[in-house]
């Protein structure tokens, strides 16, 4: 049976990232209701799934995200959340802990100027604050970076920043020619 999965719980997103492979903007008209999503959680538990990452879009734009995490936890599935970090404050962090989330991953795609250009002005500062808030709640935080020509030279500086913030988990993915990235093909590194 499957061990791990990624579930895009919404295509709704407050950002319009230049490299988003899913071209997220608003919610799809046929997104799952809370009741449907909770049934999916139960089905995943019956399948024996061990861990899942909730992503999107931006998972925290769903009002019921904590109910989904809670149901996954009830089904003995380790739940992680991948976020752009914009909405993470004390309340969100506490809800994540209370619902049983094990980790919150945040996308960081460069130093402040680069990251804000790619994602949204002010988002870098919110991520730095979110990392402090999550640590204050005892929540493990990971960083995910999409690597492309606009940020590859910044990786050593990003590493320094993450060490300063106490981040121990840094994941990379190569920017792929899909979604919004199709408008920025010159960013894709050569093999």
Regions found by a protein language model. Name each.
Residues 1-2, 167:
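A broad structural signal for short, well-ordered beta-strand segments within beta-sheet-rich domains
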């Amino acid at each position: 049976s499957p061990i791990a999965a990624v579930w895009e719980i919404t295509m709704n997103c407050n950002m319009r990232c230049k490299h988003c492979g899913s071209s997220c903007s608003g919610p799809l008209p046929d997104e799952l209701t809370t009741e449907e999503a909770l049934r999916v959680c139960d089905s995943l538990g019956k399948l024996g799934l061990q861990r899942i990452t909730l992503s999107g879009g931006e998972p925290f734009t769903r009002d019921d995200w904590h109910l989904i995490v809670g149901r996954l936890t009830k089904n003995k599935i380790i739940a992680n959340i991948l976020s752009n970090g914009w909405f993470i404050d004390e309340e969100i962090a506490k809800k994540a802990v209370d619902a049983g989330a094990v980790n919150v991953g945040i996308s960081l795609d460069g130093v402040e100027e680069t990251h804000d250009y790619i994602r949204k002005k002010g988002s870098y500062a919110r991520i730095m604050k979110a990392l402090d808030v999550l640590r204050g709640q005892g929540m493990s935080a990971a960083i995910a970076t999409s690597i492309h020509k606009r940020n590859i030279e910044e990786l050593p500086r990003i590493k320094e920043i993450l060490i300063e913030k106490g981040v121990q988990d840094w994941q990379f993915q190569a920017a792929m020619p899909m979604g919004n990235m199709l408008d920025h093909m010159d960013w894709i590194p050569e093999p």
